[in-house]
């Protein structure tokens, strides 16, 4: 999916990796089972309904699908899935799935990105959800840095997104490690 990004093209990354593997004569994508999660990219053709949480309804659907799939794989197969996706708004669904498989365990996250991705609809300058997955996983609104006034529906949808998988928070700040961050989005 690329619903969370402000520019297009991220959802083509997985296919680009597969083509590169073929060119390199790698059997990587043949030797492991693949589960494809349907995206909601058709929503890119629709008008944005929530200025500070663009396409949040579609992202919620992806979170739910991804969370269920990751949780099921980890519980039933005792395997660790490798999730290849488009923009990183979907990382929240992966985190929710891992937490659902291990609800009593602390979950650590290593975040490799130029941005901290701790925005919420209350703080986002763009409304793009790819800047919010860690805030959602942390159950964080960041109200002390609030710059946006939200309508009731946006608040309701954001609260539902944070509650994906039924556990809030999914991670704690002390279990979060950043690599490559140059913008902490103060």
Regions found by a protein language model. Give the residues of each.
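Conserved alpha-helical scaffold segments that buttress catalytic/binding sites
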Residues: 1-186
